[in-house]
Amino acid sequence: MGKYFGTDGVRGVANQELTPELAFKLGRYGGYVLAHNKGEKHPRVLVGRDTRVSGEMLESALIAGLISIGAEVMRLGIISTPGVAYLTRDMGAELGVMISASHNPVADNGIKFFGSDGFKLSDEQENEIEALLDQENPELPRPVGNDIVHYSDYFEGAQKYLSYLKSTVDVNFEGLKIALDGANGSTSSLAPFLFGDLEADTETIGCSPDGYNINEKCGSTHPEKLAEKVVETESDFGLAFDGDGDRIIAVDENGQIVDGDQIMFIIGQEMHKNQELNNDMIVSTVMSNLGFYKALEQEGIKSNKTKVGDRYVVEEMRRGNYNLGGEQSGHIVMMDYNTTGDGLLTGIQLASVIKMTGKSLSELAGQMKKYPQSLINVRVTDKYRVEENVDVKEVMTKVEVEMNGEGRILVRPSGTEPLVRVMVEAATDEDAERFAQQIADVVQDKMGLDK
């Protein structure tokens, strides 16, 4: 069986790997597995997308596939991934679909599904869809005549979602000046509207999408421009979202980056103080900084580590009934309010803590001392072979001996791209960079595409 689904749906270069033909099949087979075979003759399906130019092409093909199986499709237009998850659950739809490749370059696109409960698919559901994709021509229902359903536009869904987000905070942001970076993606209009509606004074960059500039030197993967904007406009802080709005990175008033670990710590500390943190637990991944765990320990907060990927964080949160979790990269899940990482939700919760405590973001983030961390991505021929490569294991052992317990190493395949990620934490910046480069050089030499 071919593996179509990665850790975050089906992704690839639009019109080359993720073709309209594949999008049609994903709509048809996904609609059948997740909605139609539950006995619903005309299951309701919500479809949203980000701002990529390929989104319209894939949306048309996907919707055709869904309608061909009998689905009643409501098109949400440009909206964030967590917006689709929330509306799917809130409106009682059988299925939600988001067309986006998140933080990836504009040439890529992706399709991810949400069940009626607003959660991403289980491995079993993905396997069922993949089994149909691997068949030559599976015999599935084909409605005809009056059984073919019109699709409709529900662009008001975005406002319904923003109204819900606004209801999750008890304060307005009058007196706060906030710089926003929409990554020229899904939150480009949503973020300024939401924070403006909460009476913040806003400055914006990356909020002028043209179909081609999504994530281009902007957004949560490139917060440097936002840092400049914060300092230049004397903003209290800045918030950078990614292309589909499911992750967030902040910038303090001095232009210093505040990552997902620090944001989780700030929000978790406030929840713990207010006795709102379930089981005094925050769920994180193996990528979280050593300083994050030490800071939690000092606050009397426990932590659980998962594999990298917000789906694994969510699985652990559901298993243990935990209500806060996330990743250093800025996927932060607040289960009391939504079922997936939500940049806008996290942003207003962070702003709420800043407003209520009267403390600056640098002061709040400074309570967590980060260990220097170096991350190098290596493009490789087969990312899954890194775990068995003898030469890579050998250099990792050598570095661990040299570190003498003062740091850690993590080498793993990316869940969404043909990359091996090499992460090293050490006592100093120089050590972290040197050790990471030593390991990355071996990965490149033995497995790299350009070796």
Curated annotation (Swiss-Prot):
This is Phosphoglucosamine mutase. InterPro entries: A-D-PHexomutase_a/b/a-I (IPR005844), A-D-PHexomutase_a/b/a-I/II/III (IPR016055), A-D-PHexomutase_a/b/a-II (IPR005845), A-D-PHexomutase_a/b/a-III (IPR005846), A-D-PHexomutase_C (IPR005843), A-D-PHexomutase_C_sf (IPR036900), A-D-PHexomutase_CS (IPR016066), Alpha-D-phosphohexomutase_SF (IPR005841). It comes from Staphylococcus aureus (strain NCTC 8325 / PS 47). Disruption of glmM results in a drastically reduced methicillin resistance and in teicoplanin hypersusceptibility. Keywords: Isomerase, Magnesium, Metal-binding, Phosphoprotein. SUPFAM superfamilies: Phosphoglucomutase, C-terminal domain, Phosphoglucomutase, first 3 domains. Its cofactor is Mg(2+). The gene is glmM. Activated by phosphorylation. GO terms for cellular component: cytosol. Belongs to the phosphohexose mutase family. Binds 1 Mg(2+) ion per subunit. It catalyses: alpha-D-glucosamine 1-phosphate = D-glucosamine 6-phosphate. It comes from the Bacteria. Its EC number is 5.4.2.10. The modification Phosphoserine is found at S102. Signal peptide: none annotated. Pfam families: PGM_PMM_I, PGM_PMM_II, PGM_PMM_III, PGM_PMM_IV. One of its GO terms (molecular function) is phosphoglucosamine mutase activity. GO terms for biological process: carbohydrate metabolic process; peptidoglycan biosynthetic process; UDP-N-acetylglucosamine biosynthetic process.
